[in-house]
């Protein structure tokens, strides 16, 4: 193992964030002791806790700390405590979204995997998921309807509101390229999601993706309307490999993936820019209703660390070791409350972190 020193900015945030980050620290500790992983970590405030301590959800200190790091390991932000704030000052928008914008993190990568040994976790029938699920959702993260012109007019007899979806070809092109590159290392199959029978932005999306496909002749491309895709994902999830989506459609599809495998607590995610710098976080939110109860599922946080090692630090072996340890833990039925079939028999947050750490240590 190389002795190169890696730097990770750790942003625990709010809610369950600090709890599940602690379990990721256990994994890093094993990597340091057993695999000679040389890393320096530094924690920074973000979100609600940053508002409470510094008056803003994202401080210059946090931004600079992230700039001086190789990657960001992120917990979660938000909670009812800050709901009274104006929209632009809330932890999510003023913290996480601002951070994504600052680093131009345009590509969201969210794996969705459920092995044949764990079919009982999924709410779907075994006959539907008997082959297991192994897909990855690639979502454009900085364009589309969430960033287009919008307004709400209420001081008239018939109030109205509007949102505008805008996509530049360059935005579509760069996310499509990442999807095709990832597909090349998998089953060489992409399903691109759009609504090209209705939306002009989707027509441009489809045309751009088609043009990108010419550069990757060994990858099979299929287009699917969003309404049909949501249905097919339930009917035959094992037929999907790489799913390419706009911001809005990716928001929908990626959460459907969480439902299919049984818990959003199992889904990690990566948000990358063109240089490979990334922010890695669980797909779920801050879950303030369970914060402090030691029942949060830390697996998504641990798998987010695995993605960080793979995509930003380019250490695929260490990433694979973590993935295998998590898989073994689930096969052994080490489960948190959200995925346990027996509500009286489950492991606490710290307990499953210990189990996964022990399994990882045995791989050294």
From Swiss-Prot:
Pathway assigned to this chain's UniProt record: Amino-acid biosynthesis; L-leucine biosynthesis; L-leucine from 3-methyl-2-oxobutanoate: step 3/4
Protein name: 3-isopropylmalate dehydrogenase
Subunit organization: Homodimer.
Physiological role: Catalyzes the oxidation of 3-carboxy-2-hydroxy-4-methylpentanoate (3-isopropylmalate) to 3-carboxy-4-methyl-2-oxopentanoate. The product decarboxylates to 4-methyl-2 oxopentanoate.
Residues that hold NAD(+) according to the record: 79-92, 285-297
InterPro entries xref list: IsoCit/isopropylmalate_DH_CS, IsoPropMal-DH-like_dom, Isopropylmalate_DH
Family that this chain belongs to: Belongs to the isocitrate and isopropylmalate dehydrogenases family. LeuB type 1 subfamily.
Ranges that cross the membrane: none
EC class name: oxidoreductase
